Amino acid sequence: MTSKSTLSYAERARQHDNPIARKLFEIAEAKKSNVVVSADLTTTKELLELADHLGPYIAVLKTHIDIVSDFNKETVFGLKSLSEKHNFLIFEDRKFVDIGNTVQKQYHGGALRISEWAHLVNASILAGDGIVEALAQTGTSDAFEHKGERGLLMLAEMTTRGTFATGAYTKASIESAKKHSSFVIGFISNQALTSIETQIPATHMEDFIVFTTGVNRATKGDPLGQQYQTPEAAIKRGADFIISGRGIYATSDPIQAAKLYQNEGWAAYETRIKNRSTGY
């Protein structure tokens, strides 16, 4: 798989043929931030307060909306309003993994109304390519009111110890993304996936975005198997956007932590594109 990670976000925005990918790169460039904060909070009040406080420093807010105990229309309204106020995208970390017909209903409808407010969602290839086809059908349909404003990330790898998201699974994730590139804009992975060869050849316009989870300046991991890497290490390994949760929101000063991750992530990104231009 090819990578355009040595190009600037501005260059990639100009070249990308997917409108939501272009918007993401434009946000990153404008805010000088490649930070995705994983807001794993359990009430609407906590979630919206964090989004409002950290919004100026992030490119994307990642949610696990099914852990919000009092999810309601005010949750949706608040997320959408703050996304516009602070110019960030919303990524619902739903990890869709079911038959296509069910996934379509979970995404576009149901109690969580995900397609209404989440710019990005993700899915696992575990259920087969049909799940990706189903989501792509919904997201690219002319009847879909948010066409061009939504995108899908494939869960190609995970940061947990002992994960089975490796090898053939990762390759299948890439193959599916290539088949449905009108809706799939990138991957959740621990590194650039350029070493993995697929049956589908790369196109000139191919530019999948890499989101890396488990980014934490305290690299010890946790007792439940999560493994961490620093912002600089993640960018060096090919991340375009770095996802951090507890490393930011669980600190004594989340705003200061968000600024720190923003600065470190951006500095690592600038080093990467500078090295491209100087030939190092």
Curated annotation (Swiss-Prot):
GO terms for biological process: 'de novo' pyrimidine nucleobase biosynthetic process; 'de novo' UMP biosynthetic process. Keywords: Decarboxylase, Lyase, Pyrimidine biosynthesis. The active site is at K95. InterPro entries: Aldolase_TIM, OMPdecase, OMPdecase_AS, OMPdeCOase_dom, RibuloseP-bd_barrel. GO terms for molecular function: orotate phosphoribosyltransferase activity; orotidine-5'-phosphate decarboxylase activity. Belongs to the OMP decarboxylase family. Pathway: Pyrimidine metabolism; UMP biosynthesis via de novo pathway; UMP from orotate: step 2/2. It holds the Pfam family OMPdecase. CDD domains: OMP_decarboxylase_like. It catalyses: orotidine 5'-phosphate + H(+) = UMP + CO2. SMART domains: OMPdecase. This is Orotidine 5'-phosphate decarboxylase. NCBIfam families: pyrF.
